């Protein structure tokens, strides 16, 4: 295998190094790129073996050249370059750094000792990198950009290389060792180190299971280059036959694709290509064209390219491919060579080409806005704040009133200025000039529409906004009120917690957020929630043993319970949306909202009506569990079950509330055969006459939609002829209750002609001069009463309504619901739900349809005697407590040693006030969407979609205090885009029933356990619980939450302390060193809570002093535990009171000051909790 010269390229000089030399070369196995690290600290990417065009050029971290956030720490050569499929890692003696392939920096880690020489990725953790040199080995976290552990090493390290599950370490002393990450990178117990070279080791290379080393030997007490290349099998470091190289090896490269080939070079450029399988006869000798010495060498992934650098600053590229007369050429006669990485992998990414400036034909009629805006970094004059010019006296927004005629008649002009006396009839207080009411408000409203919604961070110290803008505004005729417009959640730098939902909702009724998939269902869910019989069935359904994983009725029951408990706080239907999205039938019916664009003009009115029809039918099916359902009305039944359930002889519970009993009679015109069948309608679709009749009322159209005649052609079941069939649909007389307590109606307004029935009409006979189509009450007469001519019938009143809002045909459409809230005194108030905007409205406004911007979609009617017809007392009110005593898992391969919890005993049943510690871990189902502005700032459009992956709940009291009784991993069938292993500890396969070794349960099972603990009145202890509960999609009353994030804070400070910092400072424990563990986090949150309770029971002043000391120390350490703390913890077993002093003198003094002010807690008990946490002293919160 001969290599032929292809390129000779000198490295460009720099200001700090006029003659840089190549010190590290890497031929990219993933892309057609040669990475060159130079003695100047510059890293360059050269693309294509034919051109070596420069693609990327940046300084490595640790060199003196700054930029991109990299510090200047002295001139340092690039010692190693490693490439992954996404990133580029560089190493100098001063530190390591990671960048994207395009050169953008991602992380840096500095070494103050400036002793680094080599690095290797951790084969068991993709976020960790181990480096070494003359000092200790450092384990760096590439996600956080910090050293997480320091590992003592007896000898300087020359080379680190990743193996299958271990790391190879070649020491300067000549010893080769295999390090095991599972034991803290100590020497592997089953593989003994070997002494490869007696005089020291120069380097090593690894490919597959083969290790090649070269170095020095001793002869008569003097070091000489060892002529033997040592080979070892890495599986046991078993020596293989060595290879002789008399010139003294300086670089040895194992062929990546052929394990029998080795490329060896001496310092002077003597090159040998050795085939170990064929022996010395197959060895190829070549002399590299260098006049000095070889400084670096690299081999491509296929072995067909060889790159090396020399001491004169030249970069050489040789190849085994033909480059002479026999070389392959293209149609233009140019030589064709394969890429550096072969024909696999990805193409190098080049920067976007700058678009040429457009040519403008400049004429007198050319508008000035054809000239684009330049990039700017300060406010433009056009951003002049409105409050500076749109004041109450501004002539721009407050045009002057017309001057009265008496003033004009007596006015005299002097130098273009008019003067006139004020007549007596225009004098008095009522003629004093005043500001036009609402003018300044209109200006602010216009500005607010451009600037976005409210954030809590915009409030002043008094908790109010600087201006007094309200959602209400003055309107012109035909203008859509502001509170009807589509609302969106915006994200500030503080996240979703900074968004002020209270600005949009000042009622006791909770709204629903919009940033979830299929959020168009929010309006109907609100309408169904305030339909009390349906709410009662849904909340009772969660109390039975429903085994369907994605049960919409269960999720609706959980959502309705959350809306009940929240009492005005914002909620989200994320779990309902997740179950809905997992339903294949909904996909087939086209019920999914595929329009993720916020400017979509989708017809949501039609979509919500189809969803209403399908959802109620699904509810009806799901309300029957194991053949049993609730009997709320008197129906014949044979056998009664337990807890209000009975055998399914009659209709389902949903049918009893919403089902319309219909009888359809078909008569064949050909043979006269009559057939009939009974069915149940859950939704009535309104059918309008072809010609508009202004005399028709809503009751007439509803009656004609229930009882109607039609003609169709079909095959007669009697005569088998394809003949016309006369079909008549009517209320079933055989059913005792043809009309249900609740009637769901789809408006079916599909065009402007149909909307003509609904549009308000002027009528002087009405009080306000407007006749509305939708009445407050509707009367429907049943079949028997119709035949007898009686006027009485079933009376319904409107309970709720869903309408579509669309300001214009090309505007964004969305849905709004109106709900009539009953009260104990008999009065009722109407509430509008525009997602998370909730406000009261008048009944006339609800029933009014002034124009096509407001179109009805779903109307829910409730019988005025519904409470008398339904016996809701048979419904269960409490969840089954047995779920806390069952050990449920759907994992096929659960391992006993992975079970870390012990389920509750019956005598441990929690009660009101019982302390439990909780923590949860999550995975990402969808990455966040954001936009980057030209000034470098970013705006989050949609946050990442997180899903519960693990939840752990620990006992907070009793003999087994601190022991988990829930440790459930959550089965996730959706595609996971990021397991967030570093932060969650969740790995691929942990959430799969076929592969998970843990306790794996469906989301609904874990949710039921948490829901039961909330209902029992438990007090939840944890750190950052608001985010956890939000993602779990459960509302816990504030009086049942003890969040250490809120406990350990200073009044008026925005800083939230991390659990790791608090545990390090107060409990003297270093946690979360490798990844997060929910049991560990919950345990330490419980310890911190108990510590706070201990301080609070003694003196509030003592706790305030401790908090001041914590923040003072945190400012010195950037609120991060020193990395040295982890090293000290690993060296010795410490109790909370034996924490050693830190190396820094100031930190030692600060620690001593804090200790002097703190009451030192006693040593830990056998359960790991301090004795003060085990005492039966009453909690200060329970007092």
Swiss-Prot record:
Residues 448-469 have a biased composition (Basic and acidic residues). This is PAN2-PAN3 deadenylation complex catalytic subunit PAN2. Residues 1172-1183 have a biased composition (Polar residues). SUPFAM superfamilies: Cysteine proteinases, Quinoprotein alcohol dehydrogenase-like, Ribonuclease H-like. It comes from the Eukaryota. Residues 439-470, 1155-1183 are annotated as: Disordered. Gene3D superfamilies: Cysteine proteinases, Ribonuclease H-like superfamily/Ribonuclease H, YVTN repeat-like/Quinoprotein amine dehydrogenase. It comes from Cryptococcus neoformans var. neoformans serotype D (strain JEC21 / ATCC MYA-565). Catalytic subunit of the poly(A)-nuclease (PAN) deadenylation complex, one of two cytoplasmic mRNA deadenylases involved in mRNA turnover. PAN specifically shortens poly(A) tails of RNA and the activity is stimulated by poly(A)-binding protein PAB1. PAN deadenylation is followed by rapid degradation of the shortened mRNA tails by the CCR4-NOT complex. Deadenylated mRNAs are then degraded by two alternative mechanisms, namely exosome-mediated 3'-5' exonucleolytic degradation, or deadenylation-dependent mRNA decaping and subsequent 5'-3' exonucleolytic degradation by XRN1. The keyword Metal-binding applies. Keywords: Cytoplasm, Exonuclease, Hydrolase, Metal-binding, mRNA processing, Nuclease, Repeat, WD repeat. Contains a pseudo-UCH domain. This ubiquitin C-terminal hydrolase (UCH)-like or ubiquitin specific protease (USP)-like domain is predicted to be catalytically inactive because it lacks the active site catalytic triad characteristic of thiol proteases, with residues at the equivalent structural positions that are incompatible with catalysis, and it cannot bind ubiquitin. It functions as a structural scaffold for intra- and intermolecular interactions in the complex. Belongs to the peptidase C19 family. PAN2 subfamily. PANTHER family: DEADENYLATION COMPLEX CATALYTIC SUBUNIT PAN2, PAN2-PAN3 DEADENYLATION COMPLEX CATALYTIC SUBUNIT PAN2.
